[in-house]
């Protein structure tokens, strides 16, 4: 049965390396490509990726995982011809400028909002209210992201699923998420 006090970790935070101790141990035993964790309310994903060259597991920062997911989501939309002319990527003002480059590469508008995911949610609402702009992806440096508009807050469940999908996609191409 699940335990609400999370007895397997001292601090259930996907930004904290100690939250991955058991997962990393098992990943090494099984030769896994990824180790994923979320915070208790499943809004922030954490990920370690295996470096195929060294065999080491490397943690991705929120900026790194957000950038990787943004690029993957947009690449898949582009491949299927589903990037709308008014497509948008939304990020908090303290998030990496790599997102700017990804958005530009796919020809979508970059919207910068204040720190806090509620501002990303408000951009989605603004788009829906005005009928202008199509939200595609949003992220903040503190490990939060949202793919699509089904929610107004960050969602680690869809993010971890997308990370697994991206890992499988790149593995078929002979690459890891670290590559």
Language model region names:
Residues 1-178:
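Phosphate-binding chemistry for phosphorylated carbohydrates and sugar-nucleotides
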């Amino acid at each position: 049965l699940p335990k609400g006090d999370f007895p397997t970790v001292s601090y259930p935070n996907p930004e904290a390396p100690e939250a991955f101790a058991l997962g990393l141990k098992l990943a090494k035993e099984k030769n896994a490509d990824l180790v994923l964790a979320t915070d208790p309310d499943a809004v922030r994903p954490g990920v370690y990726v295996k470096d195929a060259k060294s065999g080491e597991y490397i943690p991705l920062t929120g900026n790194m995982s957000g950038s990787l997911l943004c690029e993957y989501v947009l690449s898949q939309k582009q491949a299927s011809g589903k990037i709308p002319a008014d497509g948008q990527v939304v990020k908090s003002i303290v998030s990496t400028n790599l997102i700017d480059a990804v958005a530009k590469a796919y020809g979508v508008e970059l919207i910068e909002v204040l720190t806090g995911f509620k501002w990303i949610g408000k951009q989605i609402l603004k788009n829906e209210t005005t009928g202008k702009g199509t939200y595609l992806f949003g992220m903040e440096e503190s490990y939060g992201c949202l793919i699509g508009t089904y929610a107004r807050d960050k969602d680690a469940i869809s993010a971890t699923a997308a990370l697994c999908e991206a890992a499988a996609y790149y593995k078929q191409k002979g690459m890891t998420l670290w590559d």
